[in-house]
Design a protein with these regions (language model features):
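Conserved alpha-helical scaffold segments that buttress catalytic/binding sites
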Residues: 2-310
Length: 310
């Protein structure tokens, strides 16, 4: 863990501890309750989509963005490390096994990416743990990621593959940018009955629509592609967005989703430290993760949440 988590020490008093000081290896998880980070440190899907090099470094950059934040009272935090496999298909399979294993220990998985092809791996892990549940996937993203995978999987094919394979999954996207998606992709989304919420829609309408979406689901998986945010706030991504979502708006939407108490997994993808400025993107991801963890403590009461969902 010392290789993944480190930082300065103010003191060893409980109220002075930083996050990096309390993270433990998953092997130390002896009882249910807590969160577990897992790194999806591959950029193979992005490179297949003709993106830029660097997202494989995103998982560790997010850890760095989290390290100096205050520890959270009454929350156990573990880490499963990064992937051994870097090829997209092998990485997705390894990641899915780790997600399923995290559930077997009664922990809440938080994925750190890496390409947005993390989605298919996460879905497979969730489905292994919850074989009969109706899954709602909510994606914060400027792009639909619903391209054809006939030739090969990329960072933009996961949702089409999931919807083709599983009739018990529904997909919603918030932060959608019409100018970032072709007409054929929009048509594909319409055919798959995707709930598409454009970035410029009123915040109240977006939150109301997502709450209605969640009501129909047994469990919810949230995935946040960091290019959903405006390039000024999140420059360190593979495909920066012009006129993207305001970060504070994104935080409010995330809070509303977490308050439904149906979220069982969340991940943060497409962070590319090589293109970041003053670590803005990785720090923003860190703040969103911190927000998530605080909500988990407040809303889920970790000792019971997993058994209730199962």
């Amino acid at each position: 863990m010392k290789k993944l988590w480190n930082g300065k020490i103010d003191s060893f008093e409980e109220d002075d501890l930083k996050l990096w000081q309390v993270v433990k290896d998953i092997s130390e998880a002896q009882e249910k309750g807590g969160v577990c980070f897992v790194g999806y440190d591959t950029e193979d899907g992005i490179l297949r989509d003709e993106g830029v090099v660097g997202a494989s470094e995103g998982a560790n950059a997010i850890r760095k963005g989290l390290s100096e934040l205050p520890s959270i009272k009454n929350l156990k935090i573990y880490d499963y490390g990064n992937l051994e496999k870097k090829n997209l298909e092998e990485a997705q399979e390894e990641y899915s096994e780790k997600i399923a294993d995290i559930y077997s220990k009664g922990l809440f998985p938080i994925g750190l990416g890496g390409g947005h092809d993390i989605v298919y791996g996460a879905y497979k892990g969730i489905r292994k743990a919850f074989p009969d549940k109706k899954i709602g996937i909510i994606s914060f993203d400027a792009h639909l990621d619903i391209k054809s995978y006939d030739e090969r999987m990329t960072s933009e094919t996961s949702f089409k593959k999931i919807l083709d394979e599983d009739e018990n999954v529904e997909y919603a996207i918030t932060g959608f940018q019409r100018l970032e998606n072709s007409r054929s992709l929009i048509r594909n989304a319409d055919e798959k009955r995707v709930l598409v919420l454009e970035e410029e829609y009123p915040e109240e309408f977006t939150i109301s629509s997502l709450k209605s979406f969640v009501k129909k689901m047994d469990i919810v998986y949230v995935t946040m592609c960091m290019d959903v945010f405006d390039g000024s706030a999140a420059p360190g991504v593979s495909f920066p967005t012009v006129l993207g979502m305001d970060a504070k708006k994104g935080r409010r939407i995330l809070r509303a989703i977490m308050e439904t108490k149906k979220v069982v997994c969340i991940d943060f993808a497409e962070i590319n430290p090589r293109y970041d400025i003053a670590s803005r993107t990785s720090r923003l991801a860190g703040y969103m993760i911190y927000e998530t963890m605080e909500k988990l403590v407040d809303m889920y009461r970790f000792t019971k949440w997993f058994d209730k969902i199962k």
